[in-house]
Amino acid sequence: MANVKVTLKDGSVKEVAAGTTLLEVAKGLSQKLGKQALLAVVDGVNKDLTDKLEHDASVEFVVPESSEGLHAIRHTAAHIMAQAIQHLFPDTKFAIGPAIANGFYYDLDIEHLFFPEDLIAIEKEIAKIVKANLPLVRSELPRSEALKMFADKDEKYKVELINDLPEDAVISTYTQGDFTDLCAGPHCPSTGRVKAFKLQSIAGAYWRGDEKNKMLQRIYGTAFPSKEELDAYLHMLEEAARRDHRKLGKELDLFSIMEEGPGFPFFHPNGMVIRNELINYWREVHRRYGYQEIKTPMILSRKLWETSGHWDHYRENMYVTEIDNEDYAIKPMNCPGGMLVYKTHPHSYRELPIRAGELGLVHRHELSGALHGLFRVRCFTQDDAHIFMMPSQIKDEIQNVIRLFDEVYATFGLKYHAELSTRPEDSMGDAETWETTTNALKSAMEDFGLDYVINEGDGAFYGPKIDFHLTDSIGRTWQCGTIQLDMLLPEKFDLTYTGEDGLKHRPVMIHRVVYGSIERFIGILIENYAGAFPAWLAPCQVRVMPITDKHYEYAKKLSDEMFKLGLRVYLDDRNEKIGYKIREAQLQKVPYMLVIGDKEVEDGTVAVRRRGEGDIGAMKQEDFIAMLQEEIADKK
């Protein structure tokens, strides 16, 4: 039998007999790899380990620690859960059961209504199936045979899925023990590879997401390569629930979402303090980095949105009105207005770069089911900036933006990583321009010392972009900042500048946001800090608490002095026990509490309690004020 050449990830080449399975190749490399491998990527395509090599190929084995490995574990876990449900509830009809970002689910058609106690029983059955270590066997069937098999089982959803496949589609099933499911795969070699799992919740879901179809029951779960990783993830979920910005937003009286305005946040006085501090900081930083601030109207003519392309490509997300018998739209983006500001007068190369920032309120229609606190809303303030420049200035400007982003995120203690998205298939512009601009982004990041990963073909059709993903205090990532090169809008709006040669030239433009959305960024900060904001952001920075009425005058004078200095101080002069006052201040996550009793009045001091630490001792009034002012100024 002829041999085939296998090119491995490290570039080495191994010869094996044609017809050798991928699992055999893995075992031939090492017993450890043979035990760990879940899948193999053959010439860029994920394959089961039972697949045979019939020709030369590049092969990379997928292990549990990789993202592909985790996806395979969760995909297989969905099948195991379905098998367990079939054992316990034989009348169940199965719809779809994919792996998703943080786990898996299966949509089920069954008269029995699932309750949390059912999940416990299903988990026990899953454990039996995992322990049995059943092999998952792939089969490819003719369409007619596949249709008959699932029709005989009265699996109408599978029949519908098969009928929707193209005539030339490969139809495959996976069998583990007594359970067979329609699936393209690939899967783990056996059920025993799913080492740690947890069923999490029950929800409703319309078949194919269409409310005209039947409502099915959906069971969510997750799976990990080890119990330690599962436990860490479940702990993170518990911590995330404790930090939920919707819960804390209510407890700390920051914002609310009313039924009279779903998706339109109401900010309360405490929330406005945080919002205004973020805006003040944004303005201070941008002034230092050479930005000018503009403001464009919220409602603009349909003609503008036709020029920008939004009317044709974004119309379903826009709120439209009629004024003087003409169509207008509430802006979903700030960019077109920024183009009009640039065009108000001619520009010379000597003026470039022009950095124009805008804190613009935009409105976008979101389906009600997608709304989520401050994270997914219908109106938000986007901290846009548009930078107009010559091609020769791209690299320097990108670095300038990265430097600004780095400073801002460091202020909040947020680490980040960058992702570069490159030219998609449906791009505009020529290959040379794309290569030049993409290389400028790469060079800017590399010279700055910024590590990045590349998302091939994931850029916008009008230019490459860099996305900044922030990591919060419990390890979750949030995409916030974006640097987007745009070769389309300057063309559409016929933007020009006069070059050194006296001729008209087209400027290059960068869109960029650092917060992304102020509302969403506030939500992220609430959860990152668990509501315990640093002093510079805290709605109330210090509470002054006299123990009895005889300490009131001293406390009042101190409070007034701090108020005059611009500190956010609250005098708690209620007729309550001091322990109660302290407890309430702790629940409100106030950074500092000043307790005033006989000794403090006599000595001209304050008894200082710091959030999270408790009593830190007595201080002179002026020393405490100086300490707090320094902490606020340093944004600690």
Each PLM stretch: what is its role?
Residues 1-75, 80-93, 100-101, 107-636:
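NTP/phosphate- and nucleic-acid-binding module
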